[in-house]
Amino acid sequence: MSYLMLDLLSLDVSEAEAEMLRHPQVGGLILFSRNFSSREQLISLVQQIRQIRPEILIAVDHEGGRVQRFREGFTLIPAMGDILPAAKGDMLLAKRWACELGFLMAIELLACDIDLSFAPVLDLNGISQVIGKRSFSAKPDEVIALAQSFIEGMAEAGMGAVGKHFPGHGSVAADSHIAQAIDEREAEAIFNQDILPFKELIAKGKLSGIMPAHVIYPKVDPNPAGFSSYWLQQILRQELGFDGVIFSDDLGMKGASFAGDYLGRAQAALDAGCDMILVCNDNPGVMSLLNGFVWPDDAPQHPTSLLKPNVAQTAIALENSARWENAKQLAEQIQLAQQAKV
């Protein structure tokens, strides 16, 4: 029955937040930098959350580069766009590195009982500054190859992958966190370029989840992708055959204001085909949904339990300290190589 993912204000769970976590429609929790002061504190916080809701899906944006919420006590994962340049264009080497970095990112989170990182970014590196080096490359074939390797590393640690931001945010200058992003390109450009990483990785069964973009593609559909049944049901579900979990991007972002207040945004996202909606950085917004929204009677067709870790695989990975240590050294090597260029 759980359709909502929310967040916390600080380093522990308040009584009011504990009450929200107990609500039957809350099935997920996303953590941010403000919820982290040290690895030990994070583990304690996760234990506190699990005592309240043992099966809740705990997620974080931990892609690497500038989008890594936990730093002290964690390895600094390089930006995905630095991998191929650091390998001097050697794709075989870059794929090997991407796999090890995916493993490292995932195992460090799983060791703290965090289920999921919303990763990898499958956007192409175009004109979008909010994407930039979060993307593996400007070329679809390179994104596909490197993302697949990164996802395979995540899977070897026991973590599923969530590709974002469908069908592609890389060719939009506006930041959908603070503005309504509009991609004026023709459908042909999107389908021949941006959508290819999603298409290929879905076909290969590599994606357990997808997060759509709060971007309008007016030459294709008048609604932002995350509120569009055309994009989510006709294209993603029917044409591409995706059978995993669709997460909305944060309904608090400016790019979501298209659909009105939180009640309107939640309804539009669920009607379009999202299985779980995210509301971040807005406790009153969460409360308005918990108290005033008419939730569906049926459970999500694609429950977030599909994204719970492979416990047996994680147990094996946690024992592989040599791989973990080697991956840390690799991450540091790539970081140093990029710093030397600056």
UniProtKB/Swiss-Prot annotation:
Signal peptide: none annotated. This is Beta-hexosaminidase. The active site is at residues 177, 249. Pfam families: Glyco_hydro_3 (PF00933). Its EC number is 3.2.1.52. It is found in: Cytoplasm. InterPro entries: Beta_hexosaminidase_bac, Glyco_hydro_3_AS, Glyco_hydro_3_N, Glyco_hydro_3_N_sf, Glycoside_hydrolase_SF, NagZ_Beta-hexosaminidase. Plays a role in peptidoglycan recycling by cleaving the terminal beta-1,4-linked N-acetylglucosamine (GlcNAc) from peptide-linked peptidoglycan fragments, giving rise to free GlcNAc, anhydro-N-acetylmuramic acid and anhydro-N-acetylmuramic acid-linked peptides. One of its GO terms (cellular component) is cytoplasm. Keywords: Cell cycle, Cell division, Cell shape, Cell wall biogenesis/degradation, Cytoplasm, Glycosidase, Hydrolase, Peptidoglycan synthesis. Substrate binds at residues 61, 69, 134, 164-165. It comes from the Bacteria. It catalyses: Hydrolysis of terminal non-reducing N-acetyl-D-hexosamine residues in N-acetyl-beta-D-hexosaminides. Pathway: Cell wall biogenesis; peptidoglycan recycling. The record marks 175 as: Important for catalytic activity. GO terms for biological process: carbohydrate metabolic process; cell division; cell wall organization; peptidoglycan biosynthetic process; peptidoglycan turnover; regulation of cell shape. It comes from Shewanella sp. (strain MR-7). Belongs to the glycosyl hydrolase 3 family. NagZ subfamily. GO terms for molecular function: beta-N-acetylhexosaminidase activity. Gene3D superfamilies: Glycoside hydrolase, family 3, N-terminal domain.
